[in-house]
């Protein structure tokens, strides 16, 4: 196809001024979300980000387990950060809210499903998933990943990728509830490793733990063993987030 013909293709028509203005306004919205997040979260360290399903109701054993984990972390001195919505996000905030450290909700505006839970000391609101995910990562000392759907899997894949590629520092990534995660781990081992798309060492980037006390102990032991921080070369490769 010659250049003249391509220039008239409907998919390549120039952007009009109104659409350009809308896109420019979105950039300012995103900048505002980053600034608000940085200002509100910078002093809330150490913190643990907890991910999990919005669809698991109170009374479910996983809800109760998430609440217990968050309470234990809060009483151990960690601010607890969740997505701010219902389900296991609510359980995380509820447990932390009853503890000694701040409960933080990173709320996302969705056309359905998401509503803010009432157990938040600090609440932030986002239109954009990617700026919200930066806030989950930037100040976290550990990640706890409860059972969840596509959103939880997206968050898990992103944090593993950031650590694997050296774009953020290595910190504990803890998957909770072996019966839920075992199939995924088997697929990692038997399919991804087998085909060479990940290495066996990549499986060491995370652990599975089911006991509440073991989760808190693992985080503390990780930092007790981490005598030195990242090298200058590693720091140079980290994302500026």
Regions found by a protein language model. Name each.
Residues 109-115, 152, 180-183:
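Short gly/pro/ser/thr-enriched loop/turn and capping motifs at secondary-structure boundaries
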Residues 46-49, 78-79, 101-105, 121-124, ...:
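Structural motif
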Residues 36-40, 78, 97-101, 111, ...:
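Generic secondary-structure signature for well-ordered alpha-helical cores
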Residues 175-241:
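C-terminal functional extensions of proteins
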Residues 127-179, 223-228:
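Active-site/ligand-binding-proximal alpha/beta "capping" segment
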Residues 87-145:
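Acidic/glycine-enriched connector segments
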């Amino acid at each position: 196809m010659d250049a003249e013909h391509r220039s008239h293709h409907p998919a390549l028509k120039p952007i009009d001024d109104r659409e350009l203005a809308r896109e420019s306004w979105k950039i300012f919205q995103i900048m505002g979300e980053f600034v608000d997040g940085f200002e509100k979260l910078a002093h809330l360290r150490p913190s643990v980000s907890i991910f999990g399903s919005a669809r698991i109701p109170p009374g479910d054993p996983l809800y109760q387990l998430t609440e217990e984990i968050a309470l234990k972390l809060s009483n151990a001195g960690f601010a607890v950060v969740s997505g701010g919505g219902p389900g296991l996000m609510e359980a995380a905030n509820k447990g932390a809210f009853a503890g000694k450290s701040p409960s933080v909700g990173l709320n996302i505006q969705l056309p359905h499903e998401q509503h803010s839970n009432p157990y938040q000391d600090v609440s932030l609101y986002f239109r954009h998933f990617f700026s919200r995910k930066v806030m989950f990562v930037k100040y976290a000392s550990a990640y706890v990943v409860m059972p969840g759907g596509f959103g939880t899997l997206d968050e898990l894949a992103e944090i593993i990728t950031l650590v694997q590629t050296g774009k953020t520092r290595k910190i504990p990534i803890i998957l909770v509830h072996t019966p839920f995660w075992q199939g995924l781990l088997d697929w990692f081992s038997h399919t991804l490793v087998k085909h060479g798309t990940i290495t066996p060492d990549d499986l060491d980037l995370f652990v599975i733990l089911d006991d509440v006390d073991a989760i808190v102990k693992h985080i503390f032991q990780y930092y007790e063993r981490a005598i030195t921080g990242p090298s200058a070369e590693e720091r140079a490769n980290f994302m500026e987030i």
